[in-house]
């Protein structure tokens, strides 16, 4: 990955609210399935905005920090996804998205961020990201003290 796109908490909340508006009316949804771990925070934000209390998870491991590796399903929500929003933070190459589509063919699959290779696999997303860009999510970063340049 040659570029980095840094996401702040404020940016993430704003993008999640945009996505929530597109998912109205809220009463059409039975619940939300968060793709762990990237979809956990966006799922919480959507659940709040849409007033949805039924939140489940599907746990798929496909990344090790910045390296993709073999996909492994650790836990899945029951059913075919009918009436559910499935959310992940991003769709990249589409590997996870393809697995989600197979597991939940009737779900409405959304992400906050989408790269070109994965865009056709989601029903909706908010932000276009170039394929060669790494997304730094706010939950992966920490605020640290930086000493003044002048030394005081």
UniProtKB/Swiss-Prot annotation:
Residues at which GMP binds: 69, 92-96, 134-135
Record: residues binding guanine: 92, 135
Gene3D superfamilies registered for this protein in UniProt: 3.40.50.2020
Entry binding sites for Mg(2+): 89
Cofactor: Mg(2+)
Main location per the UniProt record: membrane
Statement: the UniProt record of this protein carries the keyword Glycosyltransferase: yes
Cysteine disulfide links: none
Cellular localization per UniProt: Cell inner membrane
Domain of life of the source: Bacteria
Gene Ontology MF terms in the entry: guanine phosphoribosyltransferase activity; hypoxanthine phosphoribosyltransferase activity; magnesium ion binding; xanthine phosphoribosyltransferase activity
Positions with a binding annotation for xanthine: 92, 135
Catalytic activity, EC: 2.4.2.-, 2.4.2.22
Record-linked PROSITE patterns: PUR_PYR_PR_TRANSFER
InterPro entries from the UniProt entry: PRibTrfase_dom (IPR000836), PRTase-like (IPR029057), Xanthine_Guanine_PRibTrfase (IPR023747)
Keyword Membrane: yes
Catalytic activity: GMP + diphosphate = guanine + 5-phospho-alpha-D-ribose 1-diphosphate; XMP + diphosphate = xanthine + 5-phospho-alpha-D-ribose 1-diphosphate; IMP + diphosphate = hypoxanthine + 5-phospho-alpha-D-ribose 1-diphosphate
Pathway connected to this protein: Purine metabolism; GMP biosynthesis via salvage pathway; GMP from guanine: step 1/1; Purine metabolism; XMP biosynthesis via salvage pathway; XMP from xanthine: step 1/1
Membrane topology listed for this record: Peripheral membrane protein
Family label: Belongs to the purine/pyrimidine phosphoribosyltransferase family. XGPT subfamily.
Assembly: Homotetramer.
Name of the protein this chain belongs to: Xanthine-guanine phosphoribosyltransferase
Species of origin: Serratia proteamaculans (strain 568)
UniProt lineage: Bacteria, Pseudomonadati, Pseudomonadota, Gammaproteobacteria, Enterobacterales
